[in-house]
Amino acid sequence: MSIFSVVDMDENKVSAVYPLVRTAFPDVSPQQWLDYARMARMRGGLLGLRGPQGTLYGFLTYRIEESLRLGRIFAVDHLLTFELNRAAPGRQALCEAAEALARNRGCKAIELRQGSRGYAVDASAKARGWLNLGHRLEAVVFAKMLVGGVEVDDTTPVLSAAEG
């Protein structure tokens, strides 16, 4: 059983997430975060990860979208946890909550967007084509099919538009 609980972060709670945001994205101002969080809640939602004492250890933002290849998806734009355990029980708790919510909303897949650092290389031939057009490799997108989802060729990674 996890020591963490996952909670919906309503408009009265989103400002509590800002210290986590600031740690990961130091250039984001408090007002930028509040504006983004308000928009994220209108388009989907924001979940918080709380420890046993109520301390916030992470969050994720999500939206429900339609994908040509995957159908109805639960798109996670930001998932951030601060934990010392390599087993990442906080991340696991957030992912389990996201999956339950996705199933509840009738989604066939979850797309998880993460920064590209450590996952993708700018030097690939496909990436260079986009880089030469002024784009940068910003993120990769991982996809998890939910039971009853559509078939996808798992040999081709699902990456951001910058990958091509």
Which residue stretches match the model-derived regions?
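Conserved acetyl-CoA binding element of GNAT-fold acetyltransferases
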Residues: 71-83, 140
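A short, aromatic/hydrophobic, helix- or strand-capping loop or linear motif
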Residues: 28-38
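Conserved beta-strand-loop-alpha-helix junction that forms the acyl-donor binding cleft
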Residues: 111-126
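Conserved catalytic-core motifs of GNAT/GCN5-like acyltransferases
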Residues: 113-114, 132-149
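A short helix-loop-beta-strand connector motif used in the catalytic cores of GNAT acetyltransferases and
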Residues: 38-48
